[in-house]
Amino acid sequence: MVVIGHSQACLVALELNRILKKSLEALIFVAGSNEIPVNQFLLDLSKENPQKASQMMVTWGHGIDGDMSINKWPGHSHYGEGNNIMCMNKSTALRYDLHSCNDYSDGIDAAKIIKVPALAVLAKNDQMTPLKSGLKFVELIKNCETHILDCGHFLPSERPMELNSIINSFLSKLK
């Protein structure tokens, strides 16, 4: 089994490694870190005005390509898509997610015990899980192939072809 996580799901992947050690073949971390501290303003806003908080995150999360006028998908708005997806969640989901990220404290120990091959794909312009934090994270993992893409936090939508190519290459080495 290969577990892949993006952002907060990287913290979940760290914990799954503890639980499923014997079943795992590899771990893939996309725009992740071993810790994801959250600004108090955003934590408060996620309770008071979750829609505004999610709109801010969608804007921060995208790199320069997030704007419809300059992204690689003509006519596509990453901001619009992101906001539509966030509106599908329960109003309390973002608050709980942000608090879970902020409260998670076992990332260093969890990263150090990874024994399976790992892949980390980080983003140069990530404002949600900054590159500096991601690079410190991968240093904790003994066997971690690392790539950095020139985009923001939402690599799967900002650089889908590049991300898929990197993941496919990594997975092909496992066979």
Regions found by a protein language model. Name each.
Residues 1-6:
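Alpha/beta-hydrolase fold nucleophile elbow
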Residues 11-57:
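Flexible "cap/lid" loop of the alpha/beta hydrolase fold
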Residues 24-25, 141-144:
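Core-facing hydrophobic residues within beta-strands of well-ordered domains
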Residues 38-113:
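Conserved alpha/beta-hydrolase catalytic His-Asp/Glu region
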Residues 89, 129-132, 158:
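Residue-level signal for the nucleotide or nucleotide-sugar donor/cofactor binding architecture
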